[in-house]
Amino acid sequence: MSNIVIVGAQWGDEGKGKIADTLAEKADLVVRYQGGNNAGHTLVVNGKKTFLHLIPSGVLRQHTKCVIGHGVVLDPVALDEEITRLQAKGIAISAENLFVSESCTIITSYHKLLDAVRESNTSEKIGTTGKGIGPAYEDKVSRKGIKFKHLFDKDLLRSRLAISLAEKETLFRDLYKVEYPTLEQEFDKLFALGQKLKQYAADTFSIIDQAIAAGKNVVYEGAQGVLLDVDYGTYPFVTSSNTSVAGVYSGATTAGHGLDHVIGITKAYTTRVGEGPFPTELFDDVGKFIQHKGGEIGVTTGRIRRCGWLDLPLLKYSAKCSNLTSIALTKVDVLSDMDTLKVCIGYKYEGKEIYCAYPGIDLYKVEPILVEMEPFSIDETVTKDNMPAALKTYLKTIENHVGIPISSLAYGPSREQILFFEDYFKKG
């Protein structure tokens, strides 16, 4: 039995879905524990791409059960559409392999509208996906939220909707002056969706608890990345949930269950979508080359990702925030055959050199300390035995500065293009 957590160690888009899909081969459960359909995971199997936003990456494995934990904010429209799209591709999804927590907070049309009008009416853009994630978490924390189980009870749903709409109605009408669905329109839509999705509702807390007690393998699949964590991230340019390992305990299981591995998924370079500081960002042809070769376009938003060199002070910070046990390095192939290769090992900041970021640091004011690395060349024939010396040096540089080992290396989009240096399912 192993409890394994997959955490994004950067600003998201690190390739968590690929690693989760690979580990799902031996997993009994794959669990999403935070975020919502602002996540976008791409799986490539036999040359065919599958895009996931809510459903865990274990869905392509016939024996693996997929769980959406109570920490996820759930857009029932998006879930219904995703299930329909996957089923149309011949992917089996039923109440036998998909379990959605009855306690998930629901995203309504009001949340999505509020998200959109706020972003369009402010001069300080956050770069939100516009999916209603933040407003839904606001309602959850202020006790105005609607739970998944509320969709199945007409009276309860109507009363919860009235509570949720009360303040928003004034904002829509008087401040933003936009049209919005009436309570009855939203009620009719949500109740109908509830009847359709009710088959997937489950006590996921007990499902996970019983699986662990029975010695099953459980993989917890995070969304976004530690640097977008609402507490640890580059605030205010963050998401609205705990994307660090802390989200596992608040969004899926209990602290009484130990974690065997916390794997930080990390690109061999750095990317970011939307606004916010980015110390190693490249604005030249090298950045454009990485962007093009890496296919750096957001699955959820379709926005071009900003690209830069690997930032080890931020990676070390992420490792500390989530108590990472190892790193899964992805998209190494993107850096193959480059004329120039650099890595950031530290910052010059306020007259000092620092080698690990921290919550109070102003990343807009740091000067990255970049070191030249010897370029390397790899292709699909790379193995642990024939790995070029320059790549080994690149990996060792990361390990030495961050202080934890690299446990796997992904060198292409398909599930077969990955080297494992550690068996995550082998204890001790």
UniProtKB/Swiss-Prot annotation:
Active site, per annotation: D13, H41
A GO cellular component entry from the record: cytoplasm
Entry superkingdom: Bacteria
Entry keyword set: Cytoplasm, GTP-binding, Ligase, Magnesium, Metal-binding, Nucleotide-binding, Purine biosynthesis
Annotated positions binding IMP: D13, E14, G15, K16, N38, A39, G40, H41, T129, R143, Q224, T239, R303
Top EC group: ligase
Pfam family, one: Adenylsucc_synt
Residues noted as binding Mg(2+) in the record, renumbered to the chain: D13, G40
Residues that hold substrate according to the record: V299, T300, T301, G302, R303, I304, R305
Gene Ontology molecular-function annotations: adenylosuccinate synthase activity; GTP binding; magnesium ion binding
Stored PROSITE patterns: ADENYLOSUCCIN_SYN_1, ADENYLOSUCCIN_SYN_2
Binding partners and assembly: Homodimer.
Family statement: Belongs to the adenylosuccinate synthetase family.
Function statement: Plays an important role in the de novo pathway of purine nucleotide biosynthesis. Catalyzes the first committed step in the biosynthesis of AMP from IMP.
Listed name of the protein: Adenylosuccinate synthetase
